[in-house]
């Protein structure tokens, strides 16, 4: 299956942006809870 670069980048962004939005608060809370432990 051949995928052009623009489509690959679009999919990458589509996956990366929501992942970052979910991951950043999770890492902050995880580091905060581990720090208080």
Curated annotation (Swiss-Prot):
Membrane topology: Single-pass membrane protein
InterPro entries according to UniProt: PSII_PsbM (IPR007826), PSII_PsbM_sf (IPR037269)
Location(s), subcellular: Plastid, Chloroplast thylakoid membrane
GO biological process, one term: photosynthesis, light reaction
Transmembrane spans: 7-27
GO cellular component: chloroplast thylakoid membrane; photosystem II
Keyword annotations from UniProtKB, A to Z: Chloroplast, Membrane, Photosynthesis, Photosystem II, Plastid, Reaction center, Thylakoid, Transmembrane, Transmembrane helix
Main localization category: plastid
Recorded superkingdom: Eukaryota
Keyword Transcription (UniProt): no
PANTHER family: PHOTOSYSTEM II REACTION CENTER PROTEIN M (PTHR35774:SF1)
Family named by the database record: Belongs to the PsbM family.
Subunit structure and binding partners: PSII is composed of 1 copy each of membrane proteins PsbA, PsbB, PsbC, PsbD, PsbE, PsbF, PsbH, PsbI, PsbJ, PsbK, PsbL, PsbM, PsbT, PsbX, PsbY, PsbZ, Psb30/Ycf12, at least 3 peripheral proteins of the oxygen-evolving complex and a large number of cofactors. It forms dimeric complexes.
Physiological role: One of the components of the core complex of photosystem II (PSII). PSII is a light-driven water:plastoquinone oxidoreductase that uses light energy to abstract electrons from H(2)O, generating O(2) and a proton gradient subsequently used for ATP formation. It consists of a core antenna complex that captures photons, and an electron transfer chain that converts photonic excitation into a charge separation. This subunit is found at the monomer-monomer interface.
Record-given protein name: Photosystem II reaction center protein M
Lineage, uppermost ranks: Eukaryota, Viridiplantae, Streptophyta, Embryophyta, Tracheophyta
